[in-house]
A protein has these predicted regions:
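Short, solvent-exposed loop/turn elements at domain surfaces
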Residues: 11, 27-34, 59-62, 90, ...
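Extracytoplasmic
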Residues: 13-17, 46, 65-67, 74-78, ...
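Short, well-ordered beta-strand elements
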Residues: 15-24, 68, 78-81, 100-103, ...
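N-terminal lobe/hinge region of extracytoplasmic solute-binding protein
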Residues: 1-75, 82, 105, 174
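Extracellular/periplasmic solute-recognition and catalytic clefts
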Residues: 124-126, 182-193, 218-259
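Aromatic- and charge-enriched surface segment that lines or borders ligand/interaction sites
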Residues: 8-13, 33-42, 69-113, 128, ...
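Gly/Pro-rich hinge or "lid" segments in bacterial periplasmic/extracellular proteins
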Residues: 48-58, 149-216, 221-225
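Surface-exposed binding/hinge segments that line
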Residues: 82, 116-160, 178-185
Length: 259
């Protein structure tokens, strides 16, 4: 382990609200893993943890998140993940190897076809014990497979046991990540609230991150309207890809004051 990523402030204060904008025609599901429907922004990022966490300042490297340690032989014929004892879903249930296998199985059979293709080189998934799971590889030429498996979002098998995976709609699901859905207006806005007792808050790959108490997204159908809303101070961050806008649109008190 390590104390924290070099690019974060481990003592960063927590609080406040981050207001964001999405330019799209709304959303109709909280399930980003299936082909049907349009998922709300932020679900993957804030609601679900993965086995490993990528580093933002290294080329395709990752460190354990739900997985405490990872084993793979020289020939990369398999990868074994040992899960952290403290890993929990947001309802307090422990994250186990059963949940990891369920996630792999449901994503590759009922999820978006992307997952079936992405994990096509996995030949077998073996639960060794409650906290240990091994993925066997049929093709060992892809040296990145252990890292690819590390990107697997882990879903709660107990939550989905009596639910149809493709029919979640707008029922806020149980996740394992640093935020949960606290409020939404169908197709128009969604608010995430920080989980104060988030299980991974003191783990190196998470320390100093996810500091806002709330993250709020408003939806705009038109980018021009979104830009005017930003100019009016209605949200806090915008990615600009238009040279014309960059040169001419960001003027006025909100910008000249340096705030």
């Amino acid at each position: 382990g390590f104390p924290h990523f070099d690019y974060v402030n481990p003592g960063a204060p927590k609080g406040g609200v981050l207001r964001m904008a999405v330019v799209a025609n709304g959303f109709d599901t909280f399930n980003p893993f299936v082909i049907r429907g349009v998922a709300a922004a932020g679900i993957n990022t804030y609601l679900y943890d993965t086995l490993m966490e990528p580093s933002a300042d290294e080329p395709f490297s990752a460190y354990g998140l739900i997985a405490e340690s990872i084993e793979t032989p020289e020939d990369r014929s398999y990868v074994t993940f040992h899960l952290r004892d403290e890993a929990r879903f947001q309802d307090g249930e422990p994250i186990t190897a059963k949940d990891v296998k369920f996630s792999f199985d449901v994503l590759t059979t009922k999820g978006h076809p992307f997952y079936r293709n992405y994990y096509a080189d996995v030949s077998e998934v073996i639960i060794e014990d409650e906290r240990t799971i091994r993925f066997e590889f049929g093709d060992t030429n892809n040296r990145e497979l252990p890292l690819i498996l590390g990107q697997l979002p882990v879903l709660p098998s107990h939550y989905w046991k009596d639910r149809e995976f493709g029919d979640n709609g707008l029922t806020p699901p149980v996740g394992s990540g640093p935020y949960r859905i606290s409020d939404f207006e169908a197709g128009r806005s969604i608010t995430f609230k920080r989980v104060e007792d988030y299980w991974a808050r003191n783990i190196g790959v998470r320390k100093g991150r996810y500091n806002f108490d709330e993250i709020h997204y408003d939806y705009y159908k038109d980018d021009t309207v979104a830009l005017e809303s930003f100019r009016a101070g209605n949200f806090d961050f915008r990615v600009e890809s238009s040279a014309k806008n960059w040169a001419t649109a960001y003027t006025g008190n909100q910008f000249d004051s340096g705030k």
